[in-house]
Amino acid sequence: MFLVGLTGGIASGKSSVIQVFQQLGCAVIDVDVMARHVVQPGYPAHRRIVEVFGTEVLLENGDINRKVLGDLIFNQPDRRQLLNAITHPEIRKEMMKETFKYFLRGYRYVILDIPLLFETKKLLKYMKHTVVVYCDRDTQLARLMRRNSLNRKDAEARINAQLPLTDKARMARHVLDNSGEWSVTKRQVILLHTELERSLEYLPLRFGVLTGLAAIASLLYLLTHYLLPYA
């Protein structure tokens, strides 16, 4: 099994593309959802955040107040790095657990929905394939203005706050162009899924794990049938 990192930009159509992958039966892990999950009360990251940033980052119900925490780290790289040092290891642990579940269920690949895949680069080394949902800037701007009822200035400000899609497209192994008709984009998704399903890149890991399990089973057999009876 191998990992596919999927990203896009605001109003590029990433959510719609993910829905198509899910309809095709693909395994999808939303890293943003996972990041919110690991800071829930009772989890190690939640405890460490309170220890480091204080109880003022808590809501009345004990959840992390994301706005207050965001304000605390805004324009403060040291604090942001400290928060990342708390949350990123926990996110990776959850990612590994979820990925292993899909491995046991026989999936050939797992898609990780990672909004900041190329900005942070933290998870890039784990990705066998990278995919960007792209659209040209004029299309992106028009969609964002229509979807969020924004004027041109505000929409441009939101787009400019992100890494340009053209830059992401240059860094990605696969580009799904969502600039035109949705039927064309959907066809691209189906073709990419077919390509990934046919890939043999999942075999080395699966073979290695199965070999390891076979070795453990053989050892247990020897212990129970030959060594333990004479102990």
Swiss-Prot record:
Pfam families: CoaE. The gene is DCAKD. It comes from the Eukaryota. This is Dephospho-CoA kinase domain-containing protein. One of its GO terms (cellular component) is mitochondrial outer membrane. Residues 3-207 form the DPCK domain. The lineage of its organism: Eukaryota, Metazoa, Chordata, Craniata, Vertebrata. GO terms for molecular function: ATP binding; dephospho-CoA kinase activity. Belongs to the CoaE family. GO terms for biological process: coenzyme A biosynthetic process. SUPFAM superfamilies: P-loop containing nucleoside triphosphate hydrolases (SSF52540). Keywords: ATP-binding, Nucleotide-binding. It comes from Homo sapiens. InterPro entries: Depp_CoAkinase, P-loop_NTPase. ATP binds at residues 8-15.
